[in-house]
């Protein structure tokens, strides 16, 4: 693990590329941005494909991922957060890290909740995983606007199905 952390970003990126290619087929994904997120979070290069596969395809996941004691999230408040995040993000003209961050942090203020109560559900909807390299802002930036909104919509539908 130490060896990987000592590499420059370019060196790491070069070594990581063949592993990305195993699970990321979408040419519009900026692999260099993934390298920046991943380098400090990878012990061995062969772990890479399973850490990044969700960028290409959202895995099947259960709504229990939205329930997190420490983050103070449950199915109800996650649904509300996703609905509001969808509304706000869909209005964004410039899809940049800063714009996404400002939008979601303003939403946190507006809803008067903890950061995690908006960011955990969004990150979960975008990755479909318990843990991911990077949080809501990074993932949204890399996935792009259409895919981000699409995945949030899927999260909303999953959560709505459990409320009946």
Language-model region placement:
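Short His/Asp/Glu-rich catalytic/ion-coordination signatures at enzyme active sites or charged loops
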Residues: 1-8, 132-138
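Residue-level marker of positions within ordered structural domains that often coincide
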Residues: 2, 43, 127
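Small-residue-rich helix-loop
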Residues: 5-111
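Charged substrate- and nucleic-acid-binding regions of tRNA-handling and nucleotidyl-transfer enzymes
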Residues: 98-163
């Amino acid at each position: 693990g130490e060896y990987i952390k000592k590499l420059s970003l370019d060196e790491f990126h070069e070594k990581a590329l063949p592993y990305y290619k195993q699970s990321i087929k979408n040419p519009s994904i900026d692999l260099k941005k993934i390298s920046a997120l991943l380098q400090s979070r990878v012990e061995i290069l062969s772990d890479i494909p399973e850490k990044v596969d969700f960028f290409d395809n959202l895995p099947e996941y259960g709504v229990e991922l939205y329930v997190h004691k420490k983050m103070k999230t449950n199915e109800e408040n996650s649904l509300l957060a996703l609905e509001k995040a969808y509304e706000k993000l869909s209005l964004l003209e410039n899809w940049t890290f800063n714009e996404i961050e400002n939008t979601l942090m303003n939403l946190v203020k507006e809803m008067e909740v903890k950061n995690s109560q908006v960011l955990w559900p969004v990150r979960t909807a975008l990755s479909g995983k318990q843990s991911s390299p990077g949080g809501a802002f990074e993932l949204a930036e890399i996935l792009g606007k259409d895919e981000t909104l699409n995945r949030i919509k899927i999260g909303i539908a999953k959560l709505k199905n459990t409320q009946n």
